Amino acid sequence: MKKILLITIIIAILMCACVNKNDDNNKEQPPKAPEVEEIDPLKEQIEKMSIDEKIGQLVMVGLDGYELDDSALDMIDKYKVGGFILFKRNIQSAAQTLELINSLKEANEENKIPLFIAVDEEGGSVSRMPEEFIKLPTSRAVGKVNSEEFAFEIGNVIGEQIKSLGFNMNFAPVLDI
């Protein structure tokens, strides 16, 4: 009896082993395309920079006067600063401001990363824009109107004004407490 039971178990195991399963695991998978590592050009550019260049990119400086001077050139050439912020003391007219910003960008052409050229243009009493530009209401006055569309349009006007001079960063709006 034991012999028959043992033979039956062996036959059952062999029969189960011979069954052809038709599931997804047995299907032949199409060959996968080789994975191509995506190259991030920004990461690649940063890896090529020296430590001094990386540190310089963290610094934004102001400058004196209405024109590019030796001190500003030194900041660009020697220290590879990340950008400049212009204040009212740097802005006389639209033409002069455009000339200053273009000369900063031109002086930076040899560097790997373009400069941030910033301004703090909030509207109202905090305005750095030349006299030729539209004077805009304060953020408080814009808020009192209580209109998202109006606030959006004021923001667009500020953006277009500073963009027309070559600025690429604005430190506004802010919430002063």
What are the residue ranges of the model-derived segments?
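C-terminal non-catalytic regions of proteins with extracellular/luminal or membrane-system context
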Residues: 2, 19-20
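C-terminal motif of bacterial Sec signal peptides marking the signal peptidase cleavage site
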Residues: 14-17
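Enzymes and membrane/adaptor proteins characterized by extended Gly/Ser/Thr/Asp/Glu-rich
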Residues: 75-177
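Domain-core and long-helix interface of multi-subunit machines
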Residues: 61-62, 67, 72
